[in-house]
Amino acid sequence: MKNLILTASVATTLLLSSSSIPQHTTFILLPLVQKDTIAPVEKNKANTNYKPAFAGQTRISGVKTKTAYDFKVMTNKLKSPWGIAVLSEGKLLITEKEGNMRIVNAAGNISEAIAGLPKVDARAQGGLLGLVLDPQFSTNRTVYWAFTEAGTNGNHTAVAKGTLSKDEKSMQNAKVIYRSTHTHRGALHYGGRLVFDKSGNLLVTIGERSDQSTRVLAQDLKSSLGKIIRITKDGKPAANNPYANNKNALPEIYSYGHRNPQGIAFHPSNGTLWAAEFGPRGGDELNLIRPAKNYGWPVITYGIEYSGKQIGEPTIQAKKGMEQPVYYWDPVLSPSGMTFYSGKGIPEWKNNLFIAGLSSTHIARLVINNNKVVGEERLLSREAERFRDVVEGKNGELYTVTDAGKLYKITKK
């Protein structure tokens, strides 16, 4: 028996072009690697000595953007901005955690607060969270957003929709279309990002509320905590969801076993769904999301408690039936909003994933090939800001907001 160690592309060429490969030849395929890599960007000591499940799952080689790019602060007068949606004419619709939506125009001027939004519970991590425009926004002007809503025995993540008035001063007919289960007396881990799929259904991330009593519900299919859900524009479970006909599960659930997912986006070329979530102390994750899959929290994790205590007895990082993250960070990235880049403005960034980092104070650029991370870069790290969301504009520019109230615009020089 002969062993041939090849890259996947070389092996494919051989198989297609040669009929003389000896029998009983074993191909050992090496993963695709990004050219022109440098040392990994993470140089700090990890919180744990846990080993990755496969090569390239963490601390991948670094990359550096060759194209000259520039950035500017459009405004520093926002108040705890959380989510960004791109309107026409260079305008951005931005949520502020305390409960307001505002429009920032191309000159960086900020509108008055848009009237008509429901009240939010803005304590700690709660408030007005992510937002997304209806795929037919140009004709129906409908906006969807997530927020923390107070209830009788605590609060919960909710989803609302409304119609932005033509004068852009009010949200008309605003109404709540979905409320997560298990209202809880806490103020952490709400999730709160939204994205539409190609069929016009809405995917929403929901956190597990952090506490020991609620984190286990990430594994409970009768609870919406620690889940990614998929609903219609009216807040009903999408008809072809994986648990649509399962009486022992909530029909809106799409995937489960999540901790606090604050980033979600579709790959622009292959249509795959990706999500990023906060781990505990270490173990922030980037996951490839598939229906009915279990992403493991709190059973498996690459992190530890903030106290330094291990999670689980014994602690484990892998278990049959639970998905491994495509990539994880230790120390943490604190991943919030994220977007895949089209390549319109800076071609070398095409299909790269950009993730806003909070405690890490940078934007992570990830190069992804064949659903594997093959390169990582840190952008705007010298700004020392807590980046909360990042989106692509209509002309290939990137916009990002920070907890301190800044709105940045990143463009090709």
What are the roles of these predicted feature ranges?
Residues 1-4:
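Positively charged n-region of N-terminal signal peptides that target proteins for export
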Residues 105-106, 162-169, 229-239, 289-296, ...:
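Short loop/turn segments immediately following beta-strands, especially the blade-tip
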Residues 258, 373-394:
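Conserved blade-ending motifs and adjacent loop-strand segments that build the rim/top face
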Residues 112-126, 174-190, 233-254, 298-330:
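Surface-exposed loop and turn segments in beta-propeller and other repeat-based domains
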Residues 30-205, 211-212, 263-266, 272-275, ...:
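Acidic, Gly/Ser/Thr-rich repeat motifs that build Ca2+-stabilized beta-propeller blades
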Residues 212-223:
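Acidic/polar, solvent-exposed loop segments in beta-strand-rich repeat domains
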Residues 10-27, 31-35:
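Bacterial Sec-dependent signal peptides at the C-terminal "C-region" and cleavage site
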Residues 249-288:
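Repeat-solenoid scaffold signature
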